[in-house]
């Protein structure tokens, strides 16, 4: 290795920065995060550094550099656009065996600044040794996204308990297993949810040998495209012991689940295999009570026609910790991939989401509200009742010529979008593969212009709506 990675304690140690511009300010801010005593030499300071001097956070010691300024400092940074001055700083520092960094000049660096992921006291440094700074930055961005924000507080709390854990658990193996279980279990989840005091109590309980504490995370998988799964959702499924998934979760997303996790199908469809909701609710509770990290993985968003609230009510009644990771609901994802904006200043000032699959004792639908003009109506699970939906909307004032779309398998490679009018909605729905979403409203007329996803956009001739009259024409 060309550089030996070292973490330096700069707390109250003097560091000299030569330069007063933007690059110098960037280095100064990094050094201040480490509580260094920053001394500045520069002809003039930019506004940011001037403010730091006025706040007594840094010391402006001189306008001109001379060798004596290096005598009692721990590190030296040269951050000017004057090559001759940078060379002078480097030579003086080298002659006095001081570690020096000349910014953007690898040949004149006895130490370099890595890209930093800061979850203090947890820190990760990434460096290419100056060979590929952009690559190091890209790696840092990926790690930044993958490492949860609560790592720092987790390390802080754990550090304060190390002595007590060592007293109670006598062997290294016992302590290792304890910490691994703690960091991968309910303790971590509570910290993730910002429940600090509850997490401390959990740690104390974990020291009781017969204690087992599981938890449940309700995760929205999004509409199908694995790229639309959130980073937090990805973290959850890669830490799970058990994943209960439904029929709307794509195979691509299931491939991202931790390899040794148990996968349990609990899906339901309007027609086909069914798993009773009560059975799913109880299974979630039972698995958590066994001390397992359970993920309930749902298509779309768990709180949008996903019955997520019903499942969490059961967990709450039994005192089982849970968390929720929202997902992109189908109405958002599928319409975006179909080039249909849900709102548009000229055509729709509101959007309404409804389900076509309701409880048997559900109250009557307010068709008059749903049939309003200047709004977009999105119907989940409505293809089997498309004829009734079309008839009712027309009965309450929606024109038969109102544009409609039936989007099947939204955001996936197999996505298929059919365009028509309210008059022939039932016919479109009958041909639509499931799962499918119905969109009703003038915004559908923008599909032909804004569609961007899927090769069939260019391979097929679709009905075209003129934006003023909404009269159906055929593309010549």
Swiss-Prot record:
Pathway(s) of this molecule: Cofactor biosynthesis; adenosylcobalamin biosynthesis; precorrin-2 from uroporphyrinogen III: step 1/1; Cofactor biosynthesis; adenosylcobalamin biosynthesis; sirohydrochlorin from precorrin-2: step 1/1; Porphyrin-containing compound metabolism; siroheme biosynthesis; precorrin-2 from uroporphyrinogen III: step 1/1; Porphyrin-containing compound metabolism; siroheme biosynthesis; siroheme from sirohydrochlorin: step 1/1
Active site, renumbered:
246, 268
- Kindly list the positions annotated as binding S-adenosyl-L-methionine: 223, 299-301, 304, 329-330, 381, 410
Positions of region (Precorrin-2 dehydrogenase /sirohydrochlorin ferrochelatase)? 1-203
Residue stretches spanning the membrane: none
Its EC number is: 2.1.1.107, 1.3.1.76, 4.99.1.4
Q: Which residues bind NAD(+)?
A: 22-23, 43-44
Q: Which reaction does it catalyse?
A: uroporphyrinogen III + 2 S-adenosyl-L-methionine = precorrin-2 + 2 S-adenosyl-L-homocysteine + H(+); precorrin-2 + NAD(+) = sirohydrochlorin + NADH + 2 H(+); siroheme + 2 H(+) = sirohydrochlorin + Fe(2+)
Q: Could you tell me the keywords of this UniProt record?
A: Cobalamin biosynthesis, Lyase, Methyltransferase, Multifunctional enzyme, NAD, Oxidoreductase, Phosphoprotein, Porphyrin biosynthesis, S-adenosyl-L-methionine, Transferase
Q: Which GO terms describe its biological process?
A: cobalamin biosynthetic process; methylation; siroheme biosynthetic process
Cystine residue pairs: none
Q: Which portions of the sequence form the region Uroporphyrinogen-III C-methyltransferase? A: 214-476
Which InterPro entries does this chain map to?
4pyrrol_Mease, 4pyrrol_Methylase_sf, 4pyrrole_Mease_sub1, 4pyrrole_Mease_sub2, CobA/CysG_C, NAD(P)-bd_dom_sf, Siro_Cobalamin_biosynth, Sirohaem_synt_dimer_dom_sf
Q: Which GO terms describe its molecular function?
A: NAD binding; precorrin-2 dehydrogenase activity; sirohydrochlorin ferrochelatase activity; uroporphyrin-III C-methyltransferase activity
Q: Which residues in this protein are found as Phosphoserine?
A: 128
Pfam families with a match to the protein in the record: CysG_dimeriser, NAD_binding_7, Sirohm_synth_M, TP_methylase
The similarity comment for this entry is: In the N-terminal section; belongs to the precorrin-2 dehydrogenase / sirohydrochlorin ferrochelatase family.
Q: Which NCBIfam families match?
A: cobA_cysG_Cterm (TIGR01469), cysG_Nterm (TIGR01470), PRK06136.1 (NF004790), PRK10637.1 (NF007922)
Function of this protein? Then it catalyzes the NAD-dependent ring dehydrogenation of precorrin-2 to yield sirohydrochlorin. Finally, it catalyzes the ferrochelation of sirohydrochlorin to yield siroheme.
Protein name according to UniProt: Siroheme synthase
Species source reads Mannheimia succiniciproducens (strain KCTC 0769BP / MBEL55E)
Q: Which gene encodes it?
A: cysG
